[in-house]
Structure formats: structure tokens, C-alpha cells
Design a protein with these regions (language model features):
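C-terminal alpha-helical interaction appendages
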Residues: 1-101, 110, 114, 119-138
Length: 138
């Protein structure tokens, strides 16, 4: 059984990819991986896991503002993840969470950001569904 209705998946996947990319692009001197870990373990992301329409329908900029206010979040100094990788990681995590119906806080522990950074070269050209299945339920 999937985490929520299939009708939501493409929007959630796209918005999370855009969110991760937005953070990496606008803050090249901040730690994108630390943001991703915080976001995936947040109440904001839990609301998306639970298909709460208010959060599920937000755009990436709206989601960023909501997350920062709700979680009292500030970015940490560090290095941004570059290129298309943040977008892909966001999409991968959103689809993985939906596909295996796991809490996002568990997904980021089972499939760490560092693993996805290393596996990016071999996975990012695959269809997202196939990439998620290749990684498998850890």
C-alpha cells in the first residue's frame, strides 16, 4: 500500500525537488545536506507524508517559508549540493517515501543523503520509479 493517493504524487515529487533546488541555489554557502536531513525529519514533511492538503498544495517557495516559520529553521554554514542533484534528491526522497509508505524521517536514515550523492551518477538517468526500486526498501 502506498503512502497516499497516487493523484498527489507527481505534485509532491515536483515540489520537493524544486524546494531542495531552491535552497541549494539561493544559498551556495549553506549546507544543503543538513537542510535536507532537517526537512525530512520535520513536522512539515510529516504533514505531507499524511497527505494534509494545506501543505501538500504549497509551491516550493511557500513550502520554504512555511518550513522556516513552523520549524524555526535557519540554514547552517557549509557547502551547497550543486547542479541538478538537489532537485533529483528531493524528487527521489518524495517518491521513495510514497512508494514504500515509510515516514520521511525514516527514509533519510535508511537512504542517507551521502549515499544518494554517491549513487547519483548511476541513478539519476533512470525513471524515478526504477531508481527507487533499484535502491529498494532498506
Amino acid at each position: 500500500m502506498r503512502a497516499y493517493a497516487k493523484e498527489y504524487v507527481s505534485d509532491v515529487v515536483e515540489n520537493q525537488g524544486k524546494l531542495f533546488d531552491l535552497v541549494a541555489q539561493k544559498s551556495p554557502d549553506k549546507d544543503t545536506a543538513a537542510f535536507i536531513n532537517s526537512y525530512m525529519a520535520s513536522k512539515t514533511r510529516k504533514s505531507i507524508d499524511e497527505a494534509k492538503a494545506y501543505v501538500n498544495t504549497m509551491s516550493a517557495p511557500e513550502l520554504w517559508d512555511y518550513f522556516c516559520k513552523t520549524e524555526d529553521f535557519t540554514l547552517k554554514d557549509g557547502k551547497a549540493i550543486e547542479g541538478f542533484m538537489p532537485d533529483w534528491i528531493g524528487e527521489f526522497y518524495a517518491y521513495y517515501q510514497w512508494y514504500y509508505n515509510l515516514p520521511s524521517s525514516e527514509v533519510v536514515k535508511k537512504v542517507p543523503v551521502a549515499f544518494l550523492e554517491q549513487a547519483y551518477g548511476g541513478l539519476h538517468d533512470l525513471d524515478l520509479d526504477l531508481a527507487v526500486q533499484k535502491v529498494g526498501e532498506v
